[in-house]
Amino acid sequence: AKDFLFMRIQLSEHFTYRKLLRFTLPSVIMMVCTSIYGVVDSVFVSNLVGSDAFAAVNLIMPFLMVLGAVGFMLGTGGSALVAYTLGAGSEKCANEIFSLLIYALIGLGAVFTIGGIAFLTPVSRLLGADETMLPVCVSYGRIVLLGLIPYMLQNTFQSFLVTAERPQLGLYVTIAAGVTNIVLDALFVAVLQWGVEGAALATILSQFVGGAIPLVYFLRPNSSKLRLGRTSFHGRALLKACANGSSEFMTNISMSVVNMLYNWQLMRLMGSGGVAVYGVIMYVNFIFIAIFLGYSMGSAPIVGYHYGAGNRTELRGLLRKSLCIITVMSVVLTAAALLLARPLSLIFVSKEPTLLPVTIRAFSIYSLSFLMVGYNIYASSFFTALNDGFISALISFARTLVFQVAAVTVLPVLWDIDGVWAAVVAAETLALLLSAACLVGKRKKYGYA
């Protein structure tokens, strides 16, 4: 098992099913671990601080995610461009682009940190925080924003470590950051009883670990193809990276906007209890979705490299194998979600008996979306890897914003609270049709079918 996970594989190799799974597995484990650590954070808050505090954290979280979305954009878009450049044989240029993106990210992170703290109170009110939730939103948000730069770096380096053929290091970093978060959560929230401030402090200290380790690795001489150093200003490359990663940026922005809309609908239909139920579903959803995100992140540099090298035969094989792998994942995860609806709900709302049946029903309906979501995530990532930012962004924008907003606006009128939980199923079904149309329509241009 150790050899399967940690044997070094180069992007230029031919990928069998076994080799593809071996290369992407560290990214899958890394994303799942990241999600689990976030869930542990929420378990501490919901069980030890209370459901009102849990609802307040969930209310402000979309705003914090919007500010951190730039890290995902430059990470996925930049790594696709760097992988393409490496595949074309320009290692020096690839390193200059890599360095430029990291330095730009740090500068933007500083601006967003200052702006985020300045506008935190009015934004919390805008998101619907009442007088009870407002101070919790603000105190949690201010602390978390202090760790925005390392959070953005951590997200960016997750993609670049795969491009540097070091996905295992990304896994080690994630484990180190996650263990830090869990240990400090237990200390600050359970032992010292610092409440949501303790949870926020544990979060940012773990993000410093996650951002600092890869930063030091790339600043020092290393055996990978990437290293931070002097750079030239590649304006076109910077714009290209942003365009490539615009789908991931749009996904994070859209998810945050949609979460706000869900919270608004649930506050209207159920009050703060509805927001708490949605929070439970979202945290469990993060773990399941992380498997698809991890596979897409791990396979994207391979696609980008072989596209840059002009190897269309390998490109066709990668797409075919990936769709087969995602089909198996989708069926297994949907079955697991339906079987585990009750035990997973109990983890969060065991002390809230009135919320338990609502949470179980909501999760059972929501779980059907796992049949479609993997294909949509992969299709968007596939086009990002091909440096087609427009199609990638189109799929992401439609999936995470247009279809979801339409569904969560219309379906509750027809089915009341069940309509809220079914909205994501409807949105993912529509997105699957769009993804299929894009893959078929672009097959001759990119030569993958």
Can you name each region flagged by the protein language model?
Residues 1-24, 82-147, 191-246, 303-369, ...:
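Short alpha-helical transmembrane segments in multi-pass integral membrane proteins
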Residues 12-49, 62-77, 81, 106-113, ...:
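N-terminal transmembrane alpha-helices
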Residues 22-41, 143, 154, 177, ...:
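Transmembrane helical elements of multi-pass membrane transporters/channels
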Residues 27, 31, 43, 47, ...:
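Transmembrane alpha-helix boundary and packing residues in multipass membrane permease domains
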Residues 29, 33, 37, 67-71, ...:
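Residue-level hotspots within pore-lining transmembrane alpha-helices
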Residues 36-54, 124-131, 187-194, 256-287, ...:
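Helix-terminus/linker motif at the lipid-water interface of multi-pass membrane proteins
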Residues 54-114, 151-170, 277-341, 373-395:
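Small-residue-rich hydrophobic transmembrane alpha-helices
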Residues 75, 144-162, 173-181, 199-212, ...:
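Short runs within selected transmembrane alpha-helices of multi-pass transporters and secretion channels
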